[in-house]
Amino acid sequence: MPDRVLTAAEARQNLLAARGGCIGHFEVVDLMGLEDESIVDRWRDHRQIVSVRDDAGQWVFPVWQFVRKHKRIMLGIRDCLAELPFESELEPLIFFLNGMETLGGHSPLDCLRSGKIEAAIKAARQYGWRKGT
C-alpha cells in the first residue's frame, strides 16, 4: 500500500508538534524569566522569534528555539530569520526543521544546535535567494 499523502492540515500539525511542540505567550514569558510580557510581542512583530498561529488563532512558539538553561533564544535564530522570506507563517518552521542538501542533509536547526551558526545563516540566505527575496 503506498504511503498516504498528508493533508495541509496534517502537515501543519506535524510542523507545530515537531521537536517538542509549541508553547503559548505566557509560557515563553515564564521560560525566559521576562518581567515585561510585551517583549514577546515585540520579538514576534520584529521577526526575532519563530511564531505561528495555532488552530484557535493564538500565537504559539516552537520550544526548539529556546535554550532553557540560559533563558534565551538559541544563537543564530534571529540571524536566520532576518534572511528568510515570509510567504507564510509556516515558512520559518519549514526552513529550520527540514534537512537541506547544502547542509549535508542536516536541518538548519541541527546546525545551530551543533554550533554551526554561520552555516545555518548561509543556508537561510540561500533559501531566501531561491524564493526570490
What are these regions (language model features)?
Residues 1-133:
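Non-transmembrane "mature" sequence context
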